[in-house]
Amino acid sequence: MSWQTYVDDHLMCDIEGHEGHRLTAAAIVGHDGSVWAQSATFPQFKPEEMNGIMTDFNEPGHLAPTGLHFGGTKYMVIQGEAGAVIRGKKGSGGITIKKTGQALVCGIYEEPVTPGQCNMVVERLGDYLLEQGL
């Protein structure tokens, strides 16, 4: 299965029980910042934004004082899982980033999608990739 298929079929899909509700944008990105696959709506991000995210996975709390900057948008960092998941909120939307052995699974959402729904979609694929040794 191609990485693009994972994005299209497992991240940009309708959320279970909520037909028509889906993430705004999603991608699978290597730890080095290379994009493996992305939705057409996924924002272009800067290398320094990816560096900050990777630093936060290695040093949890690094982004909390400054916020999570991604694709030119600043998100307030909210409770995640140290070294495994970073979550950010901005207005009625937000971002979830799940770290696997080789990649970051990223999902961006706006209402009517809820933070919990975004977390579920992103983390389910991330957990699957971890189980596959990726």
Curated annotation (Swiss-Prot):
Xref: PROSITE patterns: PROFILIN
Name of one Pfam family that matches: Profilin
UniProt short sequence motif Involved in PIP2 interaction, positions renumbered to this chain: 84-100
Compartments where located: Cytoplasm, Cytoskeleton
InterPro entries reported for this sequence: PFN, PFN_euk, PFN_sf, Profilin_CS
Chief location of this protein within or outside the cell: cytoplasm
Residue positions, PTM Phosphothreonine: T114
Presence of the UniProt keyword Magnesium in the record: no
Further remark: The variability of the residues taking part of IgE-binding epitopes might be responsible of the difference in cross-reactivity among olive pollen cultivars, and between distantly related pollen species, leading to a variable range of allergy reactions among atopic patients.
Complex formation: Occurs in many kinds of cells as a complex with monomeric actin in a 1:1 ratio.
Function: Binds to actin and affects the structure of the cytoskeleton. At high concentrations, profilin prevents the polymerization of actin, whereas it enhances it at low concentrations.
Protein name (record): Profilin-4
